[in-house]
Amino acid sequence: MLFGNPTCMKALQFTLLVGLMLLQPLASFGQRYGDEDEAPLIPQEDFDELLMWMVDGKYEKVLYKAIRYTEDDDTKKEPVPYVFMSMAFFKISESSDEELLEKYSKALKDALKYASKFVKKDKEKEYIGEYVDYFNDLRRATMNQAEIYVDDEKFTKAKSYYKYMWTLDTEDPGAWLMYGSVLWKAKAVRDAQESWNTAEQLLIEYGGKGLEEVQQDLLKYAVIYTAEMLADEGNLTDARKWIEATDALFGTDREVQAVLRSL
């Protein structure tokens, strides 16, 4: 009955996901130094241990061990420990353990902080391609939290989440667009215009191609929110501009086109 048990299935799926996600980058990590006949700065056994702790839900153990590598002068430039930190914090943020959530009350933000550091350390993009699924889950949770703050008109708090989103991917037009819109709401007009300009240039250059599904969802939300916001202020020209700029993606989207017709 193992495979008929939803809880067991979920655990199995998570185990397989993490295993597939981490196996390749860790192998590459070891090979990177093996080519030069040098011992790796971080032993493969340590990564295996971190992986097993992730699978077993021992997230605090992951944090305690991985953070040592992020703070040690010899290993702090290595990207992989940062993504372990990020994943552990993210799983804590999703936990139903109230004591754990109270202890790590900023777990989602910490997950974003270490994910951002991972991206910066992975300058050659050697590892990031192996963590696409994780980053998409992180984006989704971040987008949801930011939307809550937007709905509550807590724009300064929302701003920090959208900033993390474009830090994870500087070519994410939806993140830049929403970052600009919450800055606009916070009366930071100049910064808002700069962020909007970045979003516009990305849409002109790429037309929304190559975005992950969650990034497309963010862009749709950003376009609708920004267009309606500008329309409410009487700026119909710019409101239409943003919807038309994403026509390649949302030209047949009923919700987006309904907003356009209302302008």
Give the ranges of each region predicted by the language model.
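Terminal, low-structured helical/coil segments at or just beyond the last alpha-helical repeat
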Residues: Y33-D35, V214-D217, A222-L263
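Start-of-domain marker
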Residues: Q31-K103
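Structural register within alpha-helical repeat arrays
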Residues: E49, M85, I92, L138, ...
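TPR alpha-solenoid repeat register
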Residues: P79-P81, A175, K209-G210, A222, ...
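Short coil/linker segments at helix-helix boundaries
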Residues: K76, M87-R140, L202-Y221
